[in-house]
């Protein structure tokens, strides 16, 4: 069962270092699911980008974030793997 939790919005960033670690691209998904589970890539972030996080999908125990719902770039929205974000502040 997915544990999706609304969180107080916070700013995070996809850094150049993160992009380099993942071959220069962070995929943005329409849902917090993988392609195998029916998720579709709706965008690809290829440059350092500041995002606003509004929801987090927790692991099966409900404790660790696995994916984050983000808004960025003039109204774009989707889900990214949590490990691809660096929290600001």
Show the residue positions of the predicted features:
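A short macromolecule-binding patch
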Residues: 74-84
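SH3-family beta-barrel domains
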Residues: 1-34, 38-47, 54-57, 61-64, ...
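SH3/SH3-like beta-barrel fold
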Residues: 68-72
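Hydrophobic/aromatic side chains embedded in well-ordered alpha-helices
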Residues: 51-53, 75
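Short strand-coil-strand connectors
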Residues: 73-74, 89
